[in-house]
Amino acid sequence: MCDLRRPAAGGMMDLAYVCEWEKWSKSTHCPSVPLACAWSCRNLIAFTMDLRSDDQDLTRMIHILDTEHPWDLHSIPSEHHEAITCLEWDQSGSRLLSADADGQIKCWSMADHLANSWESSVGSLVEGDPIVALSWLHNGVKLALHVEKSGASSFGEKFSRVKFSPSLTLFGGKPMEGWIAVTVSGLVTVSLLKPSGQVLTSTESLCRLRGRVALADIAFTGGGNIVVATADGSSASPVQFYKVCVSVVSEKCRIDTEILPSLFMRCTTDLNRKDKFPAITHLKFLARDMSEQVLLCASSQTSSIVECWSLRKEGLPVNNIFQQISPVVGDKQPTILKWRILSATNDLDRVSAVALPKLPISLTNTDLKVASDTQFYPGLGLALAFHDGSVHIVHRLSLQTMAVFYSSAAPRPVDEPAMKRPRTAGPAVHLKAMQLSWTSLALVGIDSHGKLSVLRLSPSMGHPLEVGLALRHLLFLLEYCMVTGYDWWDILLHVQPSMVQSLVEKLHEEYTRQTAALQQVLSTRILAMKASLCKLSPCTVTRVCDYHTKLFLIAISSTLKSLLRPHFLNTPDKSPGDRLTEICTKITDVDIDKVMINLKTEEFVLDMNTLQALQQLLQWVGDFVLYLLASLPNQGSLLRPGHSFLRDGTSLGMLRELMVVIRIWGLLKPSCLPVYTATSDTQDSMSLLFRLLTKLWICCRDEGPASEPDEALVDECCLLPSQLLIPSLDWLPASDGLVSRLQPKQPLRLQFGRAPTLPGSAATLQLDGLARAPGQPKIDHLRRLHLGACPTEECKACTRCGCVTMLKSPNRTTAVKQWEQRWIKNCLAVEGRGPDACVTSRASEEAPAFVQLGPQSTHHSPRTPRSLDHLHPEDRP
């Protein structure tokens, strides 16, 4: 037995922030329906809450928020007529399933890839039959984390693919999308999404004798089968397990079921406890792709007990008579599957919610010993919430306490008088729904008053760790997010300013140890990750500008090179872009015209309208080159934005190539050239900048330490401000995110629908100094267009870096549309995020990073939940 009443020594779990609904008098009653909550790999949280109107009509709402901006809530009228019982994100984090107590299932997807614009176009219905369990079909992708190989050089050794079959495959082995649900009457329903958009739905009984299903959960096997666990709610009844096989026969969905071994909770077989816990209140598989281990919780009105069970293959004794009749049987002992209890707790306070980790840590004894030896604790614990308001993190198998959080630590406004604080008499406010983040470093809970709380879960779980080991664990999880494409916001919660420099250096070191092909796949993602890390320390804030600018430069370079077309169809093995790079690398002449004559200029011919439409991007390249060269005399200042480019031969070479391309296009369309304000009318600004840029590039183009630029080059750069007007660059968009402003042990209290005045830090003050002030005219950061102080066009903003861009394109040329297509799903700060194909071999669409702004925003202003007994002030006549 495990005693959860004893807090773990040094357990580390603290509150990051809480977000509440607007307050009004007499609003202390709980929402009248059970809550559902889901956390996606994009760090989007969805949860349910009802609204009651003046005439007592109830609207079932689904609320979606980004953990970085929790106050910016988007509320969806779900059109569910009964209580929503289940919410489930897909693997890409861009689609959401909702199911209700009337058997209706809706599939929500993002409209225009906006995190605050959702639509439901497909769904299914089992009329009048409440849904008790819901899951997307497995896509066959399973990743294993090898903690013991965290020091290996290859990401392929640290994170390997596990052989796992999809629930259903299309022609060629592509996984078929769809969902499976279990109803309260014992039916299993499967809906398949065909590539044509058609939905195939089939419903079958789990067994011949249908019975009431109060609780159910769904898991998947490596062979492509589905396992469903059910309970009728009584601890005196067995927990049943079924194997479900899905197939498509003659364009129709077919479901086959088979009964598997069942179990009785051990607390019911103990004569002293037989009637103490009459109801099974929670039934969960320990992981979606681990059908051999299950967690059960039985409860009374005041207490609970938790048991962990494992399905094992055991030998079946055979009588000697049968061994003599059949020697083959004697050689190989037959086996059966049998449920065995792994661990159980002592009597606990009543459990109100359970949350399971999503980190794919193996739970075999060998792997658990390795995790213990390496002191890697993320993913080993599950969360239990109790009616007394506390939350316990317990080991997934042994159920030993790892960390404890008490709700008494919840923050209160500083100006709230003590006499006005509510008394503790009566039932404690407790979490009714919980979810762990995808790295198990954060937990979200919705309490009985509708308040949302986000907790940090320390990677050490209170165990004393060396600083180097703690950094290694965070680095390992950052690499995991880099490989999978998952958002790493929850990891940033645990990065202290003193860790940033080491983490960035070690992350770059691990990146350079990968193969060239993998480095190319991850090149933009690691820059975005470095930028988010550098925001957390005042010593590295200016690097954020450099990483952000490099992402933009890479995007411009790849887009402009892709516009080049070979003159003949039977092209050699190299593209025009590759030949441009090769020639510019080989020819080190400082005269731009001499470099240009070595190129096949016919490959650079574009339509005149296209060239003119690209002028804003070409202007940015020209301005950036001028700024870099003018800042060369101040290269000793590490705090100056752009400093890292002065020693980056790759980026300088990229700029040099673009200057050549711009020069050629300027001969075709002079009005597309960058505009410089020069003191002399006869000065060739492009030639001057190319000459200085080439000299600087020669100093650092080779691998190894860069040589110092000669004094003549520095002197020429000193003269630039007297020859050309140096532009002021917009280094960073304004961002009002939380993660860089959170302080340890100082939780924030926020309110839905009201942007807070967040406390500043040394890092955020520097960040604000590098961004445009709120009152200044806005700029479209991706199109480089000025929008004015109050834009009239609909805009969207990145939820991570704050980049603003117009929602609808003002351009019609194909080339510019190609540039804009790059930013439909994501922004600079999240470019490359989303499930990808480097290790996980997923080709799912990337999750968006934008929310809509402007006068026609689809954002619904959140209001206080109306599932309360008293009228809201706005509802009173």
From Swiss-Prot:
SMART domains: WD40. Pfam families: Med16_bridge, Med16_C, Med16_N, WD40. GO terms for biological process: positive regulation of DNA-templated transcription; positive regulation of transcription elongation by RNA polymerase II; positive regulation of transcription initiation by RNA polymerase II; regulation of transcription by RNA polymerase II; RNA polymerase II preinitiation complex assembly; transcription by RNA polymerase II. One of its GO terms (cellular component) is nucleoplasm. Residues 866-877 have a biased composition (Basic and acidic residues). The keyword Transcription applies. Keywords: Activator, Nucleus, Repeat, Transcription, Transcription regulation, WD repeat. It is found in: Nucleus. Its main location: nucleus. WD repeats lie at residues 21-71, 72-119, 120-165, 166-203, 204-257, 258-334, 335-415, 416-460, 461-495. Residues 848-877 are annotated as: Disordered. InterPro entries: MED16_bridge, Mediator_Med16, Mediator_Med16_C, Mediator_Med16_N, Quinoprot_gluc/sorb_DH_b-prop, WD40/YVTN_repeat-like_dom_sf, WD40_repeat_dom_sf, WD40_rpt. GO terms for molecular function: nuclear thyroid hormone receptor binding; nuclear vitamin D receptor binding; transcription coactivator activity. Component of the Mediator complex, a coactivator involved in the regulated transcription of nearly all RNA polymerase II-dependent genes. Mediator functions as a bridge to convey information from gene-specific regulatory proteins to the basal RNA polymerase II transcription machinery. Mediator is recruited to promoters by direct interactions with regulatory proteins and serves as a scaffold for the assembly of a functional preinitiation complex with RNA polymerase II and the general transcription factors. PANTHER family: MEDIATOR OF RNA POLYMERASE II TRANSCRIPTION SUBUNIT 16 (PTHR13224:SF6), THYROID HORMONE RECEPTOR-ASSOCIATED PROTEIN-RELATED (PTHR13224). Belongs to the Mediator complex subunit 16 family. Component of the Mediator complex, which is composed of MED1, MED4, MED6, MED7, MED8, MED9, MED10, MED11, MED12, MED13, MED13L, MED14, MED15, MED16, MED17, MED18, MED19, MED20, MED21, MED22, MED23, MED24, MED25, MED26, MED27, MED29, MED30, MED31, CCNC, CDK8 and CDC2L6/CDK11. The MED12, MED13, CCNC and CDK8 subunits form a distinct module termed the CDK8 module. Mediator containing the CDK8 module is less active than Mediator lacking this module in supporting transcriptional activation. This is Mediator of RNA polymerase II transcription subunit 16. It comes from Homo sapiens (Human).
